[in-house]
Amino acid sequence: PVSVFDGKGCEHRATVKTIKRSEIILEIAGALTVLQEPSLDITLLQGIARNDRMDLIVQKAVELGVNSIQPLWMQRSQTHLKGSRLEKRSKHWQGVIISACEQCGRATLPDLGTTMTYSDWMLSNNDRGPCFLLQPDSKTGLGALQPPGNRIHVLAGPEGGLSDDEQMLARSAGFIGIHLGPRILRTETAALAALAAMQTLWGDFN
């Protein structure tokens, strides 16, 4: 028997009936299982990092329970793709999401937003709920914040972080700057540390 999921929250038990060169035919058996998603609805706004680092962020963010990942071109992003190359990369990230769901037992695929520039996203998204900016020089730690409700956005920069202009735009849009301790973290470490801490404080890690 194998387990199959539809990406929308449902998992089935199945048995393999036929194996062909290009397909496998399964017979669905057993009860339908609806798996619970995390109670904390997190959207990760991730400044696009270099290939292997971005893959790691996407993979681990899924395991840590994000509901949505929004890739953003930022001033310090070291890779800028267009056209077919961007489409190929987006399909690759979608594959990383599917593989991560298979590994961690999630039956609902997190959304992968259409890649856009940071400024375009800021101008086109006003219904965000509480928003947090990972900012090493902030004086505010997560422990000082009140529980924000069940829907939040987390903004993490690429290698080198956000530029001064990008930080100013985030703060003017209502983002709250937070630090993750006294050490400067790599982009992949910062995003994942923030997600784990938020799930511990406000989500299903507790």
Residue ranges, per PLM feature:
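Residue-level detector of anion-binding/catalytic polar loops
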Residues: 1, 67, 176
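Short connector loops at helix/strand junctions that flank enzyme active sites
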Residues: 11, 21-23, 37-41, 149-151
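Fold-independent oxyanion-binding glycine-rich loops
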Residues: 7, 48, 115, 134-137, ...
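Short, acidic/turn-prone active-site loops that include or flank metal/cofactor-
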Residues: 31-32, 159-160, 182-185
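Structured adenosyl-cofactor binding patch, chiefly the S-adenosyl-L-methionine
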Residues: 164-206
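N-terminal positively charged helical leader segments and presequences
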Residues: 1-33
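Active-site/ligand-binding-proximal alpha/beta "capping" segment
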Residues: 125-168, 175-178
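RNA substrate-binding interface of SAM-dependent RNA methyltransferases
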Residues: 29, 33-132
